[in-house]
Regions:
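Catalytic core of Fe(II)/2-oxoglutarate
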Residues: 137-204
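Tight coil/turn sites that cap or link beta-strands
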Residues: 107, 117-118, 162
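Short, conserved beta-strand element in jelly-roll/cupin
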Residues: 113-115, 124-141, 196-198
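Non-heme Fe(II)/2-oxoglutarate
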Residues: 1-96
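Short histidine-centered beta-strand/loop micro-motifs
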Residues: 120-125, 157-158
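A short glycine-rich, His/Asp/Glu-containing loop-to-beta-strand
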Residues: 100-113
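Short hydrophobic/aromatic beta-strand or adjacent loop that forms the aromatic wall/cage
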Residues: 10-12, 128, 191-193
Length: 204
């Protein structure tokens, strides 16, 4: 695992290879179950950000895992394995006061999947802290695009397998449009993202 704490122009954390192979196997066991169109919901059903006119800012498919499993989170490999970041000291080890003084007692996990033509326009998240983990099948991507951007700061982050980025939810961010070949569609070969939205009862 490689952790990089960035402080300028705002504090965020970039982590490569956060999950070990056993954890990845468990995550993929669940993702393989979801990689059928009928199991994922369209953009308007997955807590989308909207512009001032009420237009949805993204095109992708996804699933709110907390809504599915509710009080049975232990039945989800993903919801069990992604506790790892919350149990570790990784978040609060960032030197910024923002991370060292966080109080978090709520978290929600959204599973998102991007295929050909999918994107997420610049937006902010509700909550205090956002954690993104990107995943795709195989050693090489079967898609182009899908990179991540902090749009107000012209910061571009390449999407890599098992890469995590942690940042304040109010920071504007976006995802490039995905491009895929026809023969690679509908097989779960696109861009997967596990998003953890962290906040507290005091901010909701």
């Amino acid at each position: 695992m490689k952790v990089e704490y960035i402080t300028d122009p705002f504090p965020y954390t970039l982590i490569d290879d956060f999950y070990d192979q056993k954890e990845l196997d468990g995550i993929w066991q669940e993702l393989d179950f979801y990689c059928y169109p009928e199991k994922l919901s369209p953009s308007d059903k997955t807590m989308p950000a909207m512009d001032q006119h009420g237009n949805i800012m993204k095109k992708n498919h996804g699933l709110s895992l907390d809504a599915v499993y509710r009080d049975q989170r232990i039945l989800s490999n993903i919801l069990s394995i992604n506790r790892k970041i919350l149990r570790s000291d990784t978040i609060k080890s960032h030197p910024s006061w923002f991370y060292q003084n966080l109080f978090i007692d709520l978290d929600y996990t959204l599973l998102s999947y991007y295929e050909n033509g999918d994107y997420y326009k610049p937006h902010q998240d509700a909550g205090t802290l956002t954690i993104l983990t990107w995943l795709y099948k195989g050693e090489e991507k079967k898609f182009s695009g899908g990179d991540f951007h902090f749009t107000d700061y012209n910061i571009d982050i390449e999407v890599k397998n098992n890469r995590m980025v942690i940042f304040p939810s109010m920071i504007w961010h976006a995802v490039d449009k995905i491009k895929m070949k026809e023969e690679d569609l509908d097989q779960g070969l696109g861009r997967w993202c596990l998003t953890q939205f962290l906040s507290s009862n005091l901010t909701r």
